[in-house]
């Protein structure tokens, strides 16, 4: 069973009071001390004054009050030492300071510090007659003298004779707050993972240190995201900075219950130190507010009038004041807030911790609950409220109850959670509710422009309503897609079922397959039904009568689709109906019917309202025989309708923007398209009957034209001068149309695999907007036309598999970024005549596979932006030494360079080197790269099938890798990374049969199990080195495009708790480098070694639990395996041996690694690198984000934590 234990308290001690005040009553009780106590209490500080015990209470009770206080204020006055009671107090206070860090603030009221310290002046007499106090106990008297001296040396305050007492009290209060914060700060609860980072972000926006402005900050987010919690933490940590402060809770509820005038009176009462201000008599008390620096938090604000009534205008507040408005309505903040903090969801780790703390009282689940915990965390999607309520409901229940609860939640949302979330829905008006439910039930994740068009009506401007829903945190619009939280989605669908829940035909929105089958088979639908979305994967068959849609007269949305088969899935057998339906509702706006089983639409259907029509994979031959009113149509998709003959019925679709006819293999006429003057997108891919475009065919608005796969298309003419993307891939054209310069907006020209294409137009260079030119696979193309003028926009030029032997003059392609010239492996013809790339300073990716290159020019180093260089299958024997100056180079592909004998010093930022199959390679530079300590830069060196590398060379490679891992790990610790870093810092691979001897844990097979020594996870722990030997020789070879060597580690404690991680040791990805890649085949054993940084919450596990060492990991296991590109385990190769070492940071003076040879050259060069790096420009050493190649590298070296705990 799952049991909870108490989590850490939010306070550090069990103190009942903030401050104990020690004073001499006769001196100050009725003036200074009474003022001080009143002032402290007015600022919210809990004060104990020993005046309460003057009536004869025992001194032991007085000492108890000192012990129950966080700090003491000692008011030294003229007669203070004449009271043995006061002396006892100060002795006890100083004892507590020494033993328990009790805070002490001395105030010297009309007495000098030196008199207290040296017992002179008024403090002298009592110590001249020691028998009068403490019965002459000399030891006690000496202790009191030391206490007085120590107290007087503490920084405190001397009462100013000629200054204002209120100003003096202000200073005391400020210092008291500071000391209380230091002694017992508002400790952020450890049962709220993620709250610290969120509160700091809010504090940044509030800019507390700036007293020259009044600042209003909004805290925004959906219900249950933690807005109030974050603001409350910030409030409690900072309220002491202000003269007045108040946190008004739940204004929406309290304003309805008590009214805004009451809340405003309450606010003023707190801000003005309890003064009763009659708002009705005095109006708004601006003068009172201007005199104080205030901190106000308004929680759960839902209306503009609440802000106006409670806060008013900013100019009535004193500079330095701060106001926080907590709301789920962004619109309220647009004119009232200077900045807005949007509270994010919890990430996976934070969510798992919060859930486990609620249920188990620890940061991780017990072993039997791991998988179910992951499922519940996934269900909550980072919403703290959901995690707390779910955890509360699961507390003390066994695993069977958990399983049943999870199954129940898949169908029925949690009632308590839904009740909380519905408050947001109930605040909407009718139009907002309608649009919200349509999105939740039907259109979640669709494009926002599409949804607004579909939901638009005479009464509703859906675009405005969607913006309002976004402002209220009920939906988000990201990358033009409309999204909502999973739990809000579930809430919307639950609300959608509520009306007439027993009669499906009377509900407005239907998606349950049983309900839909019922109303279609029994014709029980009514005009109430607004939308029907049927997932055909959930039903076997439906008897569809011709009159099935007759009663659904108000139906607007109809969709029959298959979630299991996005492509053709033979869905026509589902509907058992021999004839076309008699009727479709004329109010249909949205009609999607995948695999529509009839050859036309109902003849009496008037599509005057139809905006979106999709009949992919249908049996339709034509839409209608007669012309229809289709002016509302904007999107039509008839893709893969193999029987479609023509487009009759669409000639009046003058507002159509997108027409998809992909795979309509019987279509050969496009006459109706001529009238589509608003058409932007036309897809005719794989229309194999299409031989040419109609003469005089012009569509001025067209921007994307796809003719790829039209195998019979031999001729192409320009049909729009507005085209931006032109796809002619795989067509039979022999030349591109002349006068192509008229395509002044053309960005992409795709001529891939046009095998009959022999010529490109001479005026190609006049395409001034062209960014990407794809010529790959144009095997008959032997040359490019001269580039007579600069093509400044061209960034991508792909010429793989062509017969081109001379590249164009690259000086006119000065902004070229990616150039690929890869020739097939079977092509033994002459390669490139020259390499004219020296002037391309922006070139970042260069692919030159199988180009018969035997030498790189020295000017190659001028390609200062180059990040990916592929030279595979060339005749190079060595690389120029100047290659070291390619400081941006991340990836170097040298696969199958069979003549390559040596490698010089390579660029310092290189992250991925693949020298597979370099059979002549004997020597590598020492070091291979200068190990710059760029933060979190990972490196992979692959030397598979490099059989001439001797053992010394391999050891040097490993030594360099280990040195670099130490430097990177030290940098990582220096930057104090938080979270989980399991990436391999360095990974190497080479032919071999043995685990290096310095690996302390070695086993045959693929599993290591070991007990952990005490204190193994000390402050110098930085990760692990891992090693495996993989055999390929008993197999025909590994043919996967990707191979990853992975390790699943499991750390377990005595009490059964555990945490599991997945490491990556390295491997390869054939898509890295050459675009003409092929799976590699290995025929021998290979060694894989990696050094993995491991900054994981292991310390937190042991330190933050109250079970002490029982929670500290005491055993560990490491299981190694191999996966392919689909993450499936590989069975075609075997792990023979494995090894593991923990890594610890070296002392600064340690110049050696344990058990491994490090050459002097490596040590010397690394030291030089550490010195040199300080003098380099930031652009040289910063970590660059490089798009595709960077993604490929990280994809190769990435690793993951399995859901926090093991999944």
Swiss-Prot record:
GO terms for biological process: defense response; signal transduction. Changing residue 955 to K: Enhanced susceptibility to Hyaloperonospora parasitica. It is an enzyme of class 3 (hydrolase). This is Disease resistance protein RPP2B. PANTHER family: DISEASE RESISTANCE PROTEIN RPP2B, LEUCINE-RICH REPEAT-CONTAINING PROTEIN. Residues 15-180 form the TIR domain. Pfam families: C-JID, LRR_3, NB-ARC, TIR, WHD_ROQ1. The active site is at residue 89. It comes from Arabidopsis thaliana. The gene is RPP2B. The lineage of its organism: Eukaryota, Viridiplantae, Streptophyta, Embryophyta, Tracheophyta. Residues 201-445 form the NB-ARC domain.
